[in-house]
């Protein structure tokens, strides 16, 4: 703990020593010593106070006043009832918060309260409803190194979900991809492994939570080590609460379509930069339950590789397709977030209204079960168990949806459940009526118009009279408290009524608290049934969302390809089409790829013609297919793809000292080192980040290599190197291009993909419409004409040498030389040959 305080005078240091020597500050320092990496929220009355370095950090982040206790100790504070807003801002800044509550005096007659830390809130352990971001998952990652493998867990404490997986150290791309999918709020590593993870490139700007090392166990049981780390962290952060995680799901290789980090980002599956709009998730999300929304996101990021799973989803959709969905959609809106409610129950953060949510959810589930069974839809919920739980809650819970947010702020149990409770409530109601009656009587008796009877938790009930009228108070008024502008009194009659009310309130609180706790325990007994119900509800919500998307966007059911070929007819980009302005239509395109004769498409066309969009729509159609959803196309026959790679666009990674070209080559290397025969690869402009011949040589070599494979991965290779179209003579390679139309001095991008190669790049036209100054555009056009006619290279000295070893230079034949080589002399007369020779002489003289 850093206790450094600036100050120069001897008096200051004397004041500081004295301030830190008080019983309260000694207590603070003792507690703070055990939680040095947290900001300690130290409860004092109705405030949480922060001291010393905690106060400096918190006041800066929260933008609240920093003051000094006894002129020496820096401090700041927040009201206890509004702590969630402040905690949320500290969590967003990556801080941990220790909540220290006060209970009772340390000993009889002592003014110092007993205080204990009851909860440590960290970015990855949030379960409090007000601190979570809507329905979204909030994951914590635990990483563990054992020999040549990295084991990792992704746990969402707010829902209880838990995922395990592992990857070789040599394949860190998988770990990085999983971190991109789960986006953990906090990453934990064992103390002894911290330096290893800090050295990894991906983690260089990441903060870690350091965990105590666990005892060694057999190598085959390393997932158990992850469980131990999680259990220990739960005990540390939740203290004595009963929080538990569910059985882990193993993310085994081959079960889901693998996508690396770059692919997830390039395709904008769930995020578009820092925005959430214009993504596959945003246009597809028609879900009405929190579980459905989380499940949809998981299925986008983890498309299936098992055809039987796809058939199962399609069968459910076929049943739902025959009915009117509106009643089901309306019913789903009444289902609460069961997973998070159960977690709150275990973590002692539940609310009275959570029981109403469970009751409404079960009621909805029972209705849905009846209707879906009639349709032969497999809605597999534990109906009988849920009915028993529903009856138990119904017997006790106060009717209506206006249950109190906090227990004690209104009726929680229904009238008639407890005779003792009913009597206490009646006494309380009567007592409050007596208070109103007494106030009216006293105003009339004393003729004091400022007289009011009020209540607070410290003073209790009191008669308040303004200072101006206080001297006129009757002699039977007993003074209770003096304030700046008023005097407070009591009377024997008021004290008697107060005792009646407070005794009634105590009885009400005692009964409701005891029954609340009992109801929590009872609900937790049915956790398994409720979670099973939640999964079924989420899946139903997902299937309905799929059907809504189909109807809204005109998508079709794809077929499963049995021969590995990919055939999309008039396919469209789902996100671009969904977000087009009214009146605009997306231009559809077709593509066929197999693993032999038409495996590798070299795609040419100008910038802005739509090459990247075309490639992305192929990838998104494939993902939708493997989610078990419909796809935007006229028809689609698609294979199961095991890995999807995209190399679309790259930028400098300056913080890591990496150029655009180096980033591009790293991404390309990852693809070439990890693809399989069943992969789908989308390359965009490989080699553009270096000199023309370097880049073209690399691109050429990649295409030659892929062509040489006996079974070729399905590949789209977009390029501006038109020379690469000559490779269509190689096995499996064919050409596609984006059609354009030249009209007067304009170029129309028709967005249509055709077989063949592009004639021009139209780069100068794109520069013109982008706003490049006219003199530069004109000069560029002149140079282009000159270069294309003479085929001469303008050599500009490069600022850095090439990254590759230059092969021995071989002069390419000139246009004239190529013309000579093409002459068929055996078919020409001597006169014709002499005439051609004369033409060549004239042409060469002009070029000198």
UniProtKB/Swiss-Prot annotation:
It comes from the Bacteria. InterPro entries: DNA_mismatch_repair_MutS, DNA_mismatch_repair_MutS-lik_N, DNA_mismatch_repair_MutS/MSH, DNA_mismatch_repair_MutS_C, DNA_mismatch_repair_MutS_clamp, DNA_mismatch_repair_MutS_core, DNA_mismatch_repair_MutS_N, DNA_mismatch_repair_MutS_sf. Belongs to the DNA mismatch repair MutS family. This is DNA mismatch repair protein MutS. NCBIfam families: mutS1, PRK05399.1. GO terms for molecular function: ATP binding; ATP-dependent DNA damage sensor activity; damaged DNA binding; mismatched DNA binding. SMART domains: MUTSac, MUTSd. This protein is involved in the repair of mismatches in DNA. It is possible that it carries out the mismatch recognition step. This protein has a weak ATPase activity.
């Amino acid at each position: 703990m850093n206790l450094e305080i600036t100050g120069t005078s001897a008096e200051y240091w004397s004041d500081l020593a004295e301030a830190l020597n008080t019983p309260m500050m000694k207590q603070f320092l003792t507690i703070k010593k055990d939680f040095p990496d947290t900001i300690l929220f130290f409860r004092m009355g109705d405030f949480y106070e922060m001291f010393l370095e905690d106060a400096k950090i918190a006041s800066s982040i929260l933008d609240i006043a920093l003051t000094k206790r006894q002129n020496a100790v820096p401090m700041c504070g927040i009201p206890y009832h509004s702590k969630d807003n402040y905690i949320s801002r500290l969590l967003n800044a990556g801080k941990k918060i220790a909540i220290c509550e006060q209970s009772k005096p340390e000993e009889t007659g002592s003014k110092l309260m007993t205080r204990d830390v009851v909860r440590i809130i960290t970015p990855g352990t949030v379960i409090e409803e007000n601190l979570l971001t809507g329905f979204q998952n909030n994951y914590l990652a635990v990483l563990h190194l054992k020999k040549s493998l990295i084991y990792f867990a992704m746990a969402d404490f707010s829902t209880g979900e838990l995922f395990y997986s592992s990857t070789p150290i040599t394949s860190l791309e998988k770990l990085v991809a999983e971190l991109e999918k789960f986006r953990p709020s906090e990453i934990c590593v064992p103390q002894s492994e911290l330096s290893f993870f800090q050295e990894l490139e991906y983690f260089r700007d990441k903060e870690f939570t350091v965990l105590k090392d666990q005892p060694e166990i057999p190598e085959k049981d390393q997932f158990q080590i992850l469980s131990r780390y999680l259990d220990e962290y739960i005990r540390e952060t939740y203290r004595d609460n009963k929080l538990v995680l569910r059985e882990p799901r193993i993310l085994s290789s081959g079960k889901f379509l693998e996508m690396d980090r770059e692919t997830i980002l390039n395709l904008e599956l769930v995020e578009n930069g820092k925005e959430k709009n214009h993504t596959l998730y945003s246009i597809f999300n028609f879900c009405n339950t929190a579980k459905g929304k989380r499940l949809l996101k998981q299925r986008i990021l983890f498309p299936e590789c098992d055809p039987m799973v796809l058939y199962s989803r399609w069968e459910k959709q076929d049943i739902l397709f025959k009915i009117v969905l509106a009643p089901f959609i309306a019913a789903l809106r009444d289902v609460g977030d069961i997973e998070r409610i159960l977690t709150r129950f275990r973590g002692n953060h539940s609310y009275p209204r959570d029981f109403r949510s469970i009751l409404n959810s079960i009621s909805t589930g029972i209705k849905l079960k009846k209707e879906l069974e009639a349709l032969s839809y497999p809605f597999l919920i534990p109906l009988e168990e849920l009915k028993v739980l529903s009856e138990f809650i119904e017997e006790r819970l106060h009717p209506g949806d206006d249950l109190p947010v906090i227990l004690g702020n209104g009726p929680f149990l229904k009238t008639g459940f407890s005779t003792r409770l009913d009597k206490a409530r009646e006494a309380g109601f009567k007592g409050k009526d007596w208070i109103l009656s007494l106030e009216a009587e006293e105003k009339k008796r004393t003729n004091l118009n400022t007289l009011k009877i009020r209540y607070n938790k410290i003073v209790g009930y009191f008669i308040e009279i303004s200072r101006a009228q206080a001297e006129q108070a009757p002699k039977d008024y007993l003074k209770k408290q003096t304030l700046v502008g008023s005097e407070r009194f009591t009377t024997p009659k008021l004290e008697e009524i107060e005792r009646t009310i407070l005794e009634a309130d105590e009885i009400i609180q005692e009964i409701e608290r005891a029954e609340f706790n009992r109801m929590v325990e009872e609900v937790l007994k049915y956790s398994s049934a409720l979670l099973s119900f939640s999964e079924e509800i989420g899946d139903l919500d997902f299937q309905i969302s799929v059907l809504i998307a189909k109807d809204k966007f005109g998508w079709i059911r794809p077929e499963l390809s049995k021969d590995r070929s990919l055939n999309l007819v008039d396919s469209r980009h789902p996100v671009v089409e969904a977000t087009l302005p009214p009146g605009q239509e997306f231009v559809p395109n077709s593509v066929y790829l197999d693993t032999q004769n038409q495996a590798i498409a070299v795609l040419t066309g100008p910038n802005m013609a739509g090459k990247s969009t075309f490639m992305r729509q192929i990838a998104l159609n494939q993902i939708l297919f493997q989610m078990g959803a419909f796809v935007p196309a006229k028809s689609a026959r698609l294979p199961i793809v095991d890995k999807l790679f995209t190399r679309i666009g790259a930028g400098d990674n300056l913080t890591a000292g990496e150029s655009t070209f180096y980033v591009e080559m790293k991404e390309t290397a990852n693809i070439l080192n990890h693809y399989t025969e069943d992969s789908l690869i989308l390359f965009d402009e490989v080699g553009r980040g270096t000199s023309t011949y370097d880049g073209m040589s690399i691109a050429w070599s990649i295409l030659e290599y892929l062509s040489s494979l006996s079974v070729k991965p399905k590949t789209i290779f977009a390029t501006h190197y038109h020379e690469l179209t000559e490779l269509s003579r190689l096995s499996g390679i064919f050409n596609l291009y984006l059609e354009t139309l030249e009209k007067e001095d304009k170029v129309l991008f028709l967005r249509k993909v055709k077989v063949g190669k592009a004639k021009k790049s139209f780069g100068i036209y794109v520069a013109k419409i982008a706003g490049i100054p006219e003199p530069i555009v004109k000069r560029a056009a002149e140079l282009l004409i000159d270069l294309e006619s003479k085929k001469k290279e303008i050599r500009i000295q490069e600022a850095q040498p090439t990254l590759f070893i230059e092969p021995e230079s071989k002069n390419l034949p000139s246009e004239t030389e190529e013309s000579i080589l093409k002459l068929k002399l055996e078919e020409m007369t001597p006169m014709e040959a002499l005439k051609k020779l004369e033409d060549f002489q004239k042409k060469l003289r002009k070029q000198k």
